[in-house]
């Protein structure tokens, strides 16, 4: 009986050991599986990182090759361009490709030469829109041209007046004095007292230049030029090919003769002391003073 008891205990002990061994094996299997999963995960991660590194490597290599090509292209000083390179056909024939820039330059030079030749061959054409000078004689001159011409003809008129004195002549001075009712001829423009001498002289210079341009242009229909009577209105601008400077125009404007009124207005008449304080004066003395004030010094004959 004791043997059976001892064997039974031994069997139980062996069974427990077997169970423990089996449980340990199962645990080891589970741990192994976990380790395998972790290994697979790490392997996949490493492969992905390797692919990314390979892609970055390829990009860096391409960038280096492009930099080398660009540096060599710049180092040559743009002597060899991709357009100038020879292109070989599959049959083995060589075809030269001319650069587009050279073509454009050649076309531009040819066009410029053609235009220069055409301009040299064609004679200078005159404007056909100008009016006939004979017709322009019939039409009255403009006010600006009248003032310019009158400025030129003014000394001649004064000389005629000095040679042929009118009824109102001062015998002591030999100067023709206009009466109170007399005025400038209709060919001149009456300007108010507000007009300044600088503006009048500037207008006279501008009118002289315009009259010169109109006189020098020939007519397209008849081929005749404007008579020399109108050419005299050009004044000192005749024979000048360059535009005058501002200082020259200013000096001419200062030296230019201008007309306001042969008879100054009543508002500009100089009053005597007697007239200011209300004392009357004789009409004869007053008329003599008015005649003296009305004749400016610049209109006296030389």
Curated annotation (Swiss-Prot):
The keyword Cytoplasm does not apply. It comes from the Eukaryota. InterPro entries: CC190. Residues 14-72 form a coiled coil. Residues 158-171, 207-216 have a biased composition (Basic and acidic residues). Residues 178-199 have a biased composition (Polar residues). It holds the Pfam family CC190. The keyword Lipid metabolism does not apply. Residues 110-229, 278-302 are annotated as: Disordered. Keywords: Coiled coil. This is Coiled-coil domain-containing protein 190. It comes from Homo sapiens (Human). The gene is CCDC190.
């Amino acid at each position: 009986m004791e043997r059976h008891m001892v064997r039974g205990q031994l069997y139980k002990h062996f069974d427990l050991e077997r169970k423990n061994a089996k449980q340990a094996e199962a645990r080891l299997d589970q741990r192994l599986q976990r380790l395998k999963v972790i290994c697979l995960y790490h392997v996949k991660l490493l492969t992905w990182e390797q692919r990314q590194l390979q892609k970055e490597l390829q990009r860096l290599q391409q960038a280096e090759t492009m930099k080398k090509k660009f540096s060599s292209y710049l180092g040559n000083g743009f002597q060899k361009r991709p357009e100038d390179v020879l292109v070989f056909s599959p049959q083995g024939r060589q075809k030269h490709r001319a650069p587009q820039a050279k073509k454009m330059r050649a076309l531009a030079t040819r066009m410029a030469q053609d235009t220069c030749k055409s301009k040299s061959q064609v004679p200078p054409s005159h404007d056909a829109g100008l009016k006939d000078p004979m017709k322009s004689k019939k039409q009255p001159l403009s006010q600006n041209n009248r003032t310019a011409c009158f400025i030129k003809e003014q000394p001649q008129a004064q000389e005629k007046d000095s040679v042929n004195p009118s009824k109102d002549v001062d015998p002591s001075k030999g100067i023709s004095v206009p009466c109170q009712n007399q005025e400038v001829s209709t060919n001149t423009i009456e300007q108010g007292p507000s007009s300044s001498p600088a503006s009048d002289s500037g207008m006279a210079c501008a009118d002289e230049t315009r009259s010169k341009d109109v006189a020098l242009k020939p007519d397209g229909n008849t081929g005749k030029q404007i008579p020399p009577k109108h050419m005299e209105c050009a004044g000192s601008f005749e024979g000048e090919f360059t535009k005058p400077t501002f200082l020259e125009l200013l000096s001419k404007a200062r030296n230019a003769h201008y007309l306001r009124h042969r008879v100054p207005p009543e508002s500009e008449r100089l009053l005597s002391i007697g007239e200011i304080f209300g004392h009357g004066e004789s009409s004869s003395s007053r008329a003599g003073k008015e005649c003296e004030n009305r004749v400016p010094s610049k209109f006296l004959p030389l």
